[in-house]
């Protein structure tokens, strides 16, 4: 029970409860935690509460009144929203609060936290002036230590301590203010990978934001064993500035034999205790994570031994009884089970695809064959996806071995047929772990000898080596490494001694936690299965997407060169059209659709220059294999695209040409214009029988605003292109010192690109159409810039970025915002604008866009195959009606939590679309905005 003098100020408030249980919970909250006493009880429906021995007559009236009270569901939702935004938003900006004055905030914080109530402290947890919590009715209760409610320079409420004591890890005042405050250590181990620096940056800033101390352990386990301030360094917020753009790991990594022995782990334990570290976050491969989990399991015996040998005190022993461990996978091979992607894998894939794109030019010039060796000792993910993204002629990976004679015959057969059809170049990708089915390794020189001796090709070998590891991370790795770093901090703060060590994973495009031991065991089973020649089990342990990519590569690689897999009566005529603005991956979709159709026996058609090209010029061409060779690596749209809709182009003429060519299915590739086009075609079916065919939309737009999907082709290419642009701009701002750039972002009414670019580029502020720009927010942001630049005196990397979506505000344009900032800066810093414009569409598509375009296109063709016969039954029906069965044949193919699904256009158009704003109704990236603001130190109103 707190003292009666704990707080005062507000004289009288009335609160309504919807039921008896919440009424009683509220009474318990105010009496047990805040020191109120029941002064009056009227029929168990009205209670008067008053502070005990209070001179200011502070009273609360609690009334059971379902009519005036918020509903139970509303109260629960409000409490969930506040709890979820505890570390992300200032509660004062979310709802109004009931305010009290208190002379003992530290005591109040301890009482509330001991009772399990969420507590938000402002401006920080070290020296709070205001404290906020939530009562059982969802009311926001505030407590201020200010005598003057408008004061900003009140003395610190921390107990006075000596300077020496203030720097001790076991400082009593810190314990009083935050009894569960942790000290987190973060390290990188094993092979380096792009994205490790963004991960460490996220851990440091998220940890500091949540009131923790964070130590970076340099040189991996080697630094942990050696210890001392040289290897284990406390890291501040500004220390990790600029790390997003840097490749590798700035805190170093090294393999450590000593840590494999118990004596080495004992030293590591002692060093961690000396620094006060009670939680460890490790980013590395399966070996590094296995070592971390073993370290945790031995921790009780290690500290017991340290106590027995008097290397630590009894107090240290009591304080560090448990060690929380959390792992994240940093590996370019993408060889960890239980996660869809490891940190650095897509960056490495990007390096490989760029290198092969460059090699293509010289190979084509000299009509040569190139053997390209890529990394992947036990995992062929890099080789497989690189082969799919670059349309390689043949790949050799560990998961699909064959006898020496078999792979040689198969490779020569495919390459020979490609050459006979007129292809001038040959690319064969060999994973470093490629083997034949007798487990003998397959070297690049062996492959070269086969091509030279059997086909007489001028052949060269290129080993990419460590080029695959180097360089800055791509947007995907920056974003997801950052999200994993934040989640790792949450994990070590939430786990207890009984919780199995978690590993942060990406499953279904969501950041999740999986048991670390289970993930490592599954990963090691793959290598064991390959060693025991159980190749079916090895590939079954890979995720389903890996198997699908394998099948897709085999199908597209054999296009038009082997007998079709479908009988004659099952073969169709399938058309593809691009609609809307160009987007990375459009050509890849056309290439994959056409080659897959050829392998199945279908006839692929391309409609050139959109619906206007079809209606005005009958721009329909059947697709020839050699004509589209190399399209997978090209940006833009080779068949042409525009924004003309079917109704505007003459839908009657479009239907006529569909009838003339006898199309059995149509694939649309494009953005919101393609979405509207699909809707118009589906509605016109009642008048035009030729449109009663399966219709599939593959979303492709940099805005990622198409309803029915969380990913559109071109958005990843756009993010990478815009990120590279911002990296250069930020470098200029940092070199100039005291400069902020306001960069305009495309995306229409969608803030997807601006939000994710803020996370990938480290921009301090982003403005998006979903939120708009209020004058209050702009004023707060400018004040934040002033403080940032004032604190930057003498520091490097002092440039700042502000991202502004083009439609965030029609009044506060990019130029206007820059001018306002310049004026408010009063010469302390300056502001410039940068408008990249259509540069954001990107040039060569990213590997992710290429691979997903292939997957989308093949799924779309398969959908047409499944539904074509059904459509034939009602195609010429006089009594045609739009039943659910019929409407389900006009669909949007999209990704929802990494699962591909087909959603009827009618459902999406009627219920999930904001057509006037050209947007989807559900905004799925709002949590990313909160994390972006948290890591940039921005307060969002």
Swiss-Prot record:
Give the UniProt record's GO annotations in the biological process aspect: canonical glycolysis; fructose 1,6-bisphosphate metabolic process; fructose 6-phosphate metabolic process
Chain positions covered by the region annotation N-terminal catalytic PFK domain 1:
2-558
> What does the record give as the active site?
333
Binding of ATP 1 occurs at: 191, 255-256, 285-288
The entry marks the following residues as binding beta-D-fructose 2,6-bisphosphate 1, namely 739, 832
- Tell me the pathway: Carbohydrate degradation; glycolysis; D-glyceraldehyde 3-phosphate and glycerone phosphate from D-glucose: step 3/4
User: How is this protein named in the record?
Assistant: ATP-dependent 6-phosphofructokinase subunit beta
Per the record, the domain of life is Eukaryota
Top EC class, one word: transferase
As for what it does, the entry says: Catalyzes the phosphorylation of D-fructose 6-phosphate to fructose 1,6-bisphosphate by ATP, the first committing step of glycolysis.
Molecular-function GO term, any one: identical protein binding
- Offer a single GO CC term for the protein: 6-phosphofructokinase complex
* Annotated compartments: Cytoplasm
List the InterPro entries hit by this protein, alphabetically: 6-Pfructokinase_euk, ATP_PFK, Glyas_Bleomycin-R_OHBP_Dase, Phosphofructokinase_CS, Phosphofructokinase_dom, PKF_sf
The UniProt note on how this protein's activity is regulated states: Allosterically activated by ADP, AMP, or fructose 2,6-bisphosphate, and allosterically inhibited by ATP or citrate.
> Which UniProt keywords are listed?
Allosteric enzyme, ATP-binding, Cytoplasm, Glycolysis, Kinase, Magnesium, Metal-binding, Nucleotide-binding, Transferase
Q: Where does beta-D-fructose 2,6-bisphosphate 2 bind?
A: 643, 701-705, 746-748, 806, 838-841, 918
| Catalyses which reaction(s) | beta-D-fructose 6-phosphate + ATP = beta-D-fructose 1,6-bisphosphate + ADP + H(+)
Q: Which residues bind beta-D-fructose 6-phosphate 1?
A: 368, 460
> Which residues take part in binding Mg(2+)?
286
Which parts of the sequence are annotated with region: C-terminal regulatory PFK domain 2?
573-941
Q: Which Pfam families match?
A: PFK
Cite the residue spans of the region called Interdomain linker: 559-572
Q: Which annotated residues bind ATP 2?
A: 395, 400-405, 410, 557-558
- Report the cofactors: Mg(2+)
């Amino acid at each position: 029970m707190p003292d009666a003098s704990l707080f005062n100020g507000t004289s009288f408030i009335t609160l309504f409860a919807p039921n008896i249980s919440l009424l009683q919970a509220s009474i318990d909250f105010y009496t047990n935690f805040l020191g109120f006493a029941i002064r009056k009880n009227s029929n168990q429906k009205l209670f008067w509460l008053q502070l005990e021995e209070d001179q200011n007559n502070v009273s609360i009236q609690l009334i059971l009144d379902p009519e005036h009270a918020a509903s139970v569901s509303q109260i629960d939702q409000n409490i969930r929203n506040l709890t979820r935004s505890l570390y992300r938003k200032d509660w004062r900006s979310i709802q109004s609060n009931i305010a009290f004055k208190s002379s003992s905030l530290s005591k109040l914080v301890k009482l509330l936290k001991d009772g399990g109530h969420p507590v938000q402290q402002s401006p920080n947890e070290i020296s709070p002036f205001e404290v906020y919590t939530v009562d059982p009715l969802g009311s926001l209760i505030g407590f201020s230590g200010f005598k003057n409610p408008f004061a900003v320079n009140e003395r610190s409420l921390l107990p006075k301590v000596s300077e020496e004591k203030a720097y001790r890890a076991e400082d009593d005042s810190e314990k009083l203010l935050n009894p569960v405050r942790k000290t987190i250590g973060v390290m990188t181990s094993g092979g380096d990978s792009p994205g490790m620096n963004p991960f460490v940056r996220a851990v440091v800033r998220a940890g500091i934001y949540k009131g923790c101390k964070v130590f970076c352990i340099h040189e991996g386990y080697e630094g942990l064993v050696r210890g001392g301030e040289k290897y284990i360094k406390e890291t501040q917020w500004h220390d990790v500035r600029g790390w997003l753009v840097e490749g590798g790991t700035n805190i170093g990594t090294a393999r450590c034999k000593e840590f494999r022995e118990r004596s080495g782990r004992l030293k590591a334990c002692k060093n961690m205790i000396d620094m006060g570290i009670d939680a460890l976050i490790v980013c590395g491969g399966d070996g590094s994570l296995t070592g971390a989990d073993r370290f945790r399991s031995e921790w009780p015996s290690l500290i017991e031994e340290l106590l027995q040998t008097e290397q630590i005190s009894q107090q240290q022993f009591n304080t560090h009884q448990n060690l929380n461990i959390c792992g994240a996978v940093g590996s370019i091979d993408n060889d960890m089970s239980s996660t869809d992607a490891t940190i650095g894998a897509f960056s490495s894939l990007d390096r490989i695809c760029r290198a092969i794109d460059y090699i293509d030019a010289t190979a084509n010039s000299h009509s040569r064959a190139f053997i390209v060796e890529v990394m992947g000792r036990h995992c062929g993910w890099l080789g497989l996806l690189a082969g799919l993204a670059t349309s390689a002629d043949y790949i050799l990976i560990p998961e699909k071995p064959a006898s020496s004679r078999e792979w040689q015959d198969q490779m020569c057969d495919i390459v020979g047929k490609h050459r006979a059809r007129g292809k001038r170049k040959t690319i064969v990708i060999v994973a470093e772990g490629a083997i034949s089915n007798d487990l003998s390794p397959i070297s690049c020189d062996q492959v070269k000898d086969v091509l030279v001796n059997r086909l007489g090709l001028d052949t060269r070998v290129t080993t990419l080596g460590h080029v695959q590891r180097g360089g800055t991370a791509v947007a995907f790795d920056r974003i997801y490494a950052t999200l994993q770093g934040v989640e790792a901090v949450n994990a070590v703060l939430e786990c207890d001694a009984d919780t199995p060590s978690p590993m942060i994973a990406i499953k279904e495009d969501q950041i999740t936690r999986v048991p670390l031991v289970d993930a490592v065991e599954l990963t090691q089973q793959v290598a064991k299965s390959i060693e025991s020649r159980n190749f079916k089990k090895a590939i079954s342990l890979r995720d389903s997407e890996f198997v699908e990519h394998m099948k897709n590569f085999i199908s597209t690689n054999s296009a038009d060169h082997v007998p079709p897999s479908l009988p004659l009566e099952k073969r169709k005529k399938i058309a593809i059209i691009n609609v809307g603005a160009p987007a990375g991956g459009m050509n890849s979709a056309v290439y994959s659709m056409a080659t897959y159709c050829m392998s199945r026996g279908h006839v692929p058609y391309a409609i050139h220059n959109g619906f206007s090209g079809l209606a005005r010029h009958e721009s329909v061409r059947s697709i020839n294999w050699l004509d589209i060779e190399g399209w997978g690596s090209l940006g833009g749209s080779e068949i042409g695209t525009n924004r003309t809709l079917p109704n505007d182009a003459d839908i009657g003429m479009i239907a006529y040409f569909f009838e003339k060519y006898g199309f059995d299915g149509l694939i649309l590739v494009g953005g919101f214009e393609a979405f509207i086009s699909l809707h118009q075609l589906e509605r016109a079916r009642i008048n035009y029988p030729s449109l009663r065919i399966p219709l599939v939309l593959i979303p492709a737009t940099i805005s990622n605003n198409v309803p029915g999907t969380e990913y559109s082709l071109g958005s990843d290419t756009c993010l990478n292109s815009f990120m590279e642009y911002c990296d250069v701009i930020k470098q200029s701002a940092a070199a100039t010192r005291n400069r902020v750039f306001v960069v305009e972002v495309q995306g229409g009414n969608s803030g997807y690109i601006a939000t994710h670019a803020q996370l990938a580029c480290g921009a301090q502020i982003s403005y998006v159409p979903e939120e708009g720009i209020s004058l209050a927010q702009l004023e707060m942001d400018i004040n934040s810039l002033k403080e940032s630049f004032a604190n930057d005196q003498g520091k490097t990397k002092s440039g700042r970025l502000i991202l502004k979506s083009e439609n965030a505000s029609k009044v506060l344009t990019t130029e206007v915002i820059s001018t306002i900032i310049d004026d408010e800066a009063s010469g302390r810093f300056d502001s410039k604008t940068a408008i990249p414009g259509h540069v954001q569409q990107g040039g060569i598509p990213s590997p992710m866009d290429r691979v997903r375009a292939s997957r989308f296109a093949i799924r779309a063709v398969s959908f047409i195959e499944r539904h074509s016969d059904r459509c034939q039954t009602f195609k010429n029906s006089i009594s045609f009606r739009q039943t659910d069965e019929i409407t389900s044949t006009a669909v949007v193919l999209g990704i929802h939590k990494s699962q591909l699904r087909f959603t009827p256009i009618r459902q999406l158009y009627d219920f999930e679309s904001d057509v006037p704003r050209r947007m989807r109704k559900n905004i799925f990236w709002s949590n990313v905005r909160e994390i972006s603001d948290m890591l940039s130190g921005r307060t969002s109103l």
